[in-house]
Amino acid sequence: QLCLLQPLGSGGFGSVYKATYHGATVAVKQVKNSSKNRLASRQSFWAELNVARLQHNNVVRVVAASTCAPASQNSLGTIVMEYVGNITLHHVIYGTGDVWRQSEDDEGGCGRKALSMEETVCYSCDIMTGLAFLHSQGIVHLDLKPANIFITEQGVCKIGDFGCSQKLEEGLSQSPHVCQQGGTYTHRAPELLKGERVTA
């Protein structure tokens, strides 16, 4: 049913692979069972599943998940997601890994094109639409940054990597100490940096 094809990347809580699942191309995230911080590993795995039942064009869709893993692997669980490619907004902004944006008559002298105004507006609208949907479902991402915005071959932005996300109780906000203070410090929400409550 599930066949790993090639690694796409790795991070603090696990590795991501391109794979096939029931014949369809998918992305598979294996959350590692960290011996240093087991609670954080578990929280990251379950946080990824905050969006498991949600479907939106600007949010990476979870297809399946399992806590079963081969004994030889130090994995807490496996999450199967739609495959949206391996290009992120980070690649596009900083010119890394974005083969499809190379240009001979580059504007910045770095061999890459600057984002056009149309692309900038389209990407911004996609991200805001995805965020508005997540917030309407009571989900806050808590690690929104260019590296977690995936861009499909059709140029659609999809928000991914929900390992730091929180599902807020209806009508309530959470104090910052309730949230796992994960995520990237330089991209942390202003209210968290100021010690205020998290709201959607």
UniProtKB/Swiss-Prot annotation:
Residues 2-200 form the Protein kinase domain. The keyword Kinase applies. Keywords: ATP-binding, Kinase, Nucleotide-binding, Serine/threonine-protein kinase, Transferase. The keyword ATP-binding applies. Transmembrane segments: none annotated. Disulfide bonds: none annotated. One of its GO terms (molecular function) is ATP binding. It catalyses: L-seryl-[protein] + ATP = O-phospho-L-seryl-[protein] + ADP + H(+); L-threonyl-[protein] + ATP = O-phospho-L-threonyl-[protein] + ADP + H(+). PROSITE patterns: PROTEIN_KINASE_ATP, PROTEIN_KINASE_DOM, PROTEIN_KINASE_ST. It is an enzyme of class 2 (transferase). ATP binds at L8, G9, S10, G11, G12, F13, G14, S15, V16, K29. Gene3D superfamilies: Phosphorylase Kinase, domain 1, Transferase(Phosphotransferase) domain 1. It comes from the Eukaryota. Belongs to the protein kinase superfamily. Ser/Thr protein kinase family. This is Serine/threonine-protein kinase mos. It comes from Ciconia nigra.
